[in-house]
């Protein structure tokens, strides 16, 4: 029988590394007589894996009546679908819930269960929530709910087990629930959950407090004279102390963790293939709580992620989304590397949009592998329709611009997926190459919750979507400044890990834990380079005065409250050496101490400090992404990198060419992207090698990405470099793709002559390195080694 393992970034199936190229086909929404055609279209697109949900309420429409063979409806034939996928050579990822989301009635939870046991429903602070909302939230840890889930698993698990890859079937992974996030209510602090099992004396809230704090801790933290845990009620408004609100948030994360553990242990008794989960909490920085819980309880779970940018509107993935995707992949890389599991984007948006521009689709899909995610599943790859009575968001339709439509037609981004999937599953060493940024951004997890809530009780704005994560945020500025970055959790990361970076950027609000402030002090003292903005923390995690970082740096940032209302914020001009009137938004604070490096008029608003073996840049304003003729914001980032001695391994002559270097053992691929879409041309220097030599530049006619090989070797032959993507190297034939230019330059070592198919040689030079320029009318051409 087969074996499913993993190594590095890839799955290992029967001893062979496999890069997952998958697509979601929800068999219960597609006519059964069309399954084979749709699967064949997936294979045509270069896919090797099919992903599907198994909806509880579809297969158990009435309590105790199960159908997995299509006896009551042909689209309930789970067994037939699995056998067909196996016959056609697909791997299968299966997601049996109990909750599947999927824009499906109740997210898969049966109506009969809710009707019979309304006590399982989550409650608001004032009682029950409306019953007719599209996903009625359920109290995860309610014993009645868990008992019902157990009965569902008793029915569906034997079917899944029979078709596991380890039993000769196609299933290589089984997932836990779907995006466990308290039915997406985790984003709102007081929407849920006030179910009696949580709020009653001795309930789950009280239990969690006892496990995490002494009463003395809570007296200090919540500013109350408590004699017993039962006196500490669940918060219901922002009038409560902020530390208590953050604890309420963390308590709900803990309930999710406990629920996931219950499901995992149930699955682990049945399945010997990887058990997976998608985006726990639907948060990012909070993932630390999940990964820590996994380590503490020895849960061997593969954590997947997802990327959505245009939900029910036309596609919108241009350069101003790069910051968010760098950030999300960064924190994801941080955790999955430590967990040792392969990164996989299980829901990479390929549908649920009015239209999807193929160049924007390419930008999203092609940026994921260089950012550490070679395994990509496209959701929803095949469109369908909802059986009557099971619809949720979409009425009858479940074809919202999928690559393969309900009628089997192919939409424009089908070809984009095909090209990338074929490259990622065949290019020599590409999937294993690693991004190794010299810069990191440090994230402090409590800020994430305040941003979600729109919390307004601090001096600094908590609108991190505007100033950090969003289209105009700092992270997009860094990405568009050719500054690849990792993302690290400041509460979890070790000092040695921080010191492995040449520069650390930190966005600070009024408070930061004592431990993190002290860690940043030690980081600078031991030689680290810190950039911190737009203030320095003055309080600790309990909102008690604490300012070890400020005291160590000897820098004072003046106190002035930031504005929240977008109609009331200021537009101000900050200048620096070589920077004349750079636009910044919202309050600009004066900075005293250190060497002034930025000014608002005559007032210093930025300072450079050398301390211990390191340095710090302290800014009293927010840096954001703006594009203009003067390009001041990118120039300011480059200035700060130069000030602190940060040098990338690559340089570009055109700053709109965005580069992500992926390095393997003795070789590299440079992902070179045109994110804006207008034609650009330029040269790249990588570790001292400037390319191209014969052409006058690398041309990128439109939005898109090339994966340029450097030093890729087989035997005595080496691709020294190429200005086209190396798709495949089979025997003596190298297949290249360049869809962004009609001319490509290839440099080979260990070769005297070549034959070109799909193009013609129009220039060349020989010697130790054979260089040729190929003019090719199509995207693909082949170079045969003679």
Curated annotation (Swiss-Prot):
Main subcellular location: cytoplasm
Localization, UniProt: Cytoplasm
pH-activity relationship: Optimum pH is 6.0 (with reduced chitobiose as substrate).
Reactions catalysed: beta-D-glucosaminyl-(1->4)-N-acetyl-D-glucosamine + H2O = D-glucosamine + N-acetyl-D-glucosamine
Expression triggers: Induced by GlcNAc(2). Also induced, to a lesser extent, by colloidal chitin.
Keywords for this protein: Cytoplasm, Glycosidase, Hydrolase
Known outcome of mutating residue 306 to Q: Retains 40% of wild-type activity
SUPFAM superfamilies in UniProt: (Trans)glycosidases, Class I glutamine amidotransferase-like
Superkingdom of origin organism: Archaea
Positions that bind substrate: 53, 102-103, 178-179, 306, 347, 379
UniProt-listed GO biological process terms: chitin catabolic process; galactose catabolic process
Molecular function terms, GO-annotated: 2-acetamido-4-O-(2-amino-2-deoxy-beta-D-glucopyranosyl)-2-deoxy-D-glucose exo-beta-D-glucosaminidase activity; beta-galactosidase activity
Keyword presence, Nucleotide-binding: no
Temperature dependence: Optimum temperature is 80 degrees Celsius (with reduced chitobiose as substrate).
Pfam families: GLMA_2nd, GLMA_C, Glyco_hydro_42
GO cellular component, one term: vacuole
Active site per UniProt: 179, 347
Function: Exo-type enzyme that specifically cleaves the non-reducing terminal glycosidic bond of chitooligosaccharides. Catalyzes the hydrolysis of GlcN-GlcNAc to glucosamine (GlcN) and N-acetylglucosamine (GlcNAc). Involved in chitin degradation. Can also hydrolyze reduced chitobiose (GlcN2OH) and chitooligosaccharides of various chain lengths.
Subunit structure: Homodimer.
Descriptive protein name: Exo-beta-D-glucosaminidase
Organism per entry: Thermococcus kodakarensis (strain ATCC BAA-918 / JCM 12380 / KOD1) (Pyrococcus kodakaraensis (strain KOD1))
Gene this chain is encoded by: glmA
């Amino acid at each position: 029988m087969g074996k499913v393992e993993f190594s590095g970034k890839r799955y290992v199936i029967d001893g062979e590394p496999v890069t997952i190229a998958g697509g979601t086909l929800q068999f219960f929404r597609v006519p059964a007589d069309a399954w084979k055609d749709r699967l064949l279209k997936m294979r045509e697109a270069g896919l090797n894996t099919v992903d599907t949900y198994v909806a509880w309420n579809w297969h158990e429409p009435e309590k105790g009546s199960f159908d997995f063979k299509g006896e009551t409806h042909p689209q309930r034939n789970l067994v037939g679908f699995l056998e067909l996928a196996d016959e056609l050579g697909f791997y299968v990822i299966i997601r049996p819930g109990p909750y599947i989301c999927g824009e499906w009635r109740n997210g898969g939870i049966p109506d009969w269960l809710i009707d019979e046991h309304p006590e399982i429903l989550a409650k608001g602070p004032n009682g029950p929530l409306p019953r007719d909302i599209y996903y009625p939230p359920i109290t995860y840890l309610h014993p009645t709910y868990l008992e019902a889930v157990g009965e569902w698993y008793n029915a569906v698990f034997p079917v899944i087990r029979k078709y596991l890859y380890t039993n000769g079937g196609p299933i290589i992974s089984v997932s836990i629930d779907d995006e466990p996030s308290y039915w997406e209510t985790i984003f709102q602090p007081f929407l849920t959950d006030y179910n009696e099992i949580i709020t009653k004396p001795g309930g789950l809230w009280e239990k969690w407090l006892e496990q995490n704090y002494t009463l003395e801790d809570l007296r200090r933290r919540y500013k109350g004279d408590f004699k017993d845990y039962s006196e500490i009620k669940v918060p219901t408004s922002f009038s409560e102390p902020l530390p208590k609100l953050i604890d309420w948030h963390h308590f709900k994360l803990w309930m999710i963790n406990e629920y996931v553990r219950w499901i995992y242990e149930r699955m682990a008794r049945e399945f010997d293939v990887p058990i997976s989960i998608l985006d726990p909490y639907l948060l990012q920085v909070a993932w630390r709580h999940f990964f820590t819980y996994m380590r503490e309880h020895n849960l061997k779970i593969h954590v997947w992620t997802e990327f959505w940018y245009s939900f029910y509107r036309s596609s919108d993935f241009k350069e101003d989304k790069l910051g968010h995707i760098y950030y999300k992949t960064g924190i994801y890389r941080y955790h999955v590397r430590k967990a040792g599991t392969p990164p996989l984007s299980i829901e990479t948006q390929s549908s649920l949009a009015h239209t999807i521009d193929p160049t924007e689709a390419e930008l999203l899909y092609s940026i994921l592998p260089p950012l550490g995610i070679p395994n990509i599943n496209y959701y929803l790859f095949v469109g369908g329709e909802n059986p009557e009575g099971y619809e949720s968001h979409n009425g009858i339709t479940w074809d919202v611009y999928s690559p393969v439509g309900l009628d089997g037609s192919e939409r424009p981004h089908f070809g984009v997926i095909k090209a990338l999937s074929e490259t990622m599953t065949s290019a020599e060493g590409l999937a294993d190459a690693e991004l190794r940024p010299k810069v990191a951004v440090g994230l402090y997890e409590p800020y994430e919750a305040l941003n979600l809530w729109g919390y307004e009780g601090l001096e600094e704005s908590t609108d991190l979507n505007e100033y950090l994560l969003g289209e105009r945020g700092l992270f997009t500025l860094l990405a568009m400044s050719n500054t690849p970055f990792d993302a690290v959790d400041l509460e979890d990361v070790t000092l040695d890990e921080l010191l492995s970076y040449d520069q650390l950027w930190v966005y600070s609000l009024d408070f930061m834990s004592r431990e993190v402030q002290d860690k940043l002090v030690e980081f600078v003292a031991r030689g680290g380079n810190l950039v911190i903005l737009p203030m320095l923390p003055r309080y600790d995690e309990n909102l008690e005065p604490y300012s070890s970082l400020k005291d160590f740096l000897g820098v004072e940032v003046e106190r002035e409250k930031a504005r929240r209302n977008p109609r009331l914020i200021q537009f101000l001009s900050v200048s620096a050496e070589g920077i004349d009137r750079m636009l910044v938004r919202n309050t600009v604070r004066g900075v005293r101490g250190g060497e002034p490096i930025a000014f608002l008029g005559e007032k210093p608003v930025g300072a450079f400090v050398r301390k211990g073996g390191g340095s710090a840049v302290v800014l009293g304003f927010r840096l954001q992404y703006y594009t203009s003729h003067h390009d001041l914001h990118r120039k300011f980032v480059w200035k700060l990198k130069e000030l602190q001695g940060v040098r990338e391994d690559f340089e570009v002559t055109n700053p709109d060419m965005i580069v992500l270097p992926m390095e393997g053992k003795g070789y590299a691929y440079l992902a070179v992207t045109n994110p804006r879409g207008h034609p650009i041309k330029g040269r790249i220097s990588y570790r001292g090698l400037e390319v191209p030599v014969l052409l006058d530049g690398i041309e990128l006619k439109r939005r898109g990405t090339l994966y340029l090989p450097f030093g890729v070797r087989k035997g005595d032959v080496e691709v020294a470099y190429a200005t086209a993507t190396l798709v495949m190297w089979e025997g003596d034939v190298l297949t290249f793709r360049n869809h962004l230019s009609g001319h490509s330059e290839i440099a080979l070592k260990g070769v005297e002559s070549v034959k070109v198919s799909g193009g013609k040689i129009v220039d060349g030079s020989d010697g130790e390195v054979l260089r040729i320029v190929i003019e090719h009318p199509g995207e693909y051409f082949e170079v045969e080694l003679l």
